[in-house]
């Protein structure tokens, strides 16, 4: 799957949760919060979607060899998508897959949720909860690696029809 914009996040969510939630892949229509933190208001989703599409467009123009800028822009995308929290549930899993696919398009791997590394997940949670771009950028910078084109072509997310 090629990430074209925020709509791709909705496709990913639908694919991941279609057997769990009837509303999988659909934007939430209710206001939500977690631990007292209010997420983005649904009344302004359209503006936020356009903004995230703009950030993704900027990301696509970054040269593959600019790892610093690559990590910074992915952190910015992650921070904004997390604050947006467009789904009632499953936001974290969908956004991690979304970022993984963005990285893969640049020929890089990114696994923000490795099963054997609890500290990565804890730093991810701290960065997203506190909207800490420095922590998110450093984490992404540490986790991205180059992959061969063969791997990138054969390890794509393929949504069900």
Region annotations inferred by a language model:
Residues 1-161:
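FIC/Doc superfamily catalytic core
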């Amino acid at each position: 799957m090629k990430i074209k914009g925020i709509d791709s996040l909705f496709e990913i969510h639908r694919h991941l949760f279609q057997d769990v939630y009837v509303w999988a892949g659909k934007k939430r229509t209710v206001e939500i919060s977690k631990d007292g933190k209010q997420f983005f208001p649904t009344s302004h989703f359209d503006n936020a979607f356009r903004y995230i599409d703009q950030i993704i467009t900027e990301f696509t123009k970054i040269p593959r060899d600019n790892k610093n800028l690559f990590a910074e822009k992915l952190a910015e995308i992650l921070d904004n998508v997390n604050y947006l929290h467009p789904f009632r549930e499953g936001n974290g899993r969908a956004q991690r897959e979304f970022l993984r696919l963005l990285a893969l398009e640049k020929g890089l791997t990114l696994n923000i949720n490795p099963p054997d590394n609890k500290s990565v997940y804890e730093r991810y949670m701290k960065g997203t909860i506190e909207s800490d771009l420095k922590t998110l950028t450093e984490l992404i910078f540490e986790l991205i690696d180059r992959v061969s084109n063969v791997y990138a072509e054969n390890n794509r997310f393929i949504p069900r029809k």
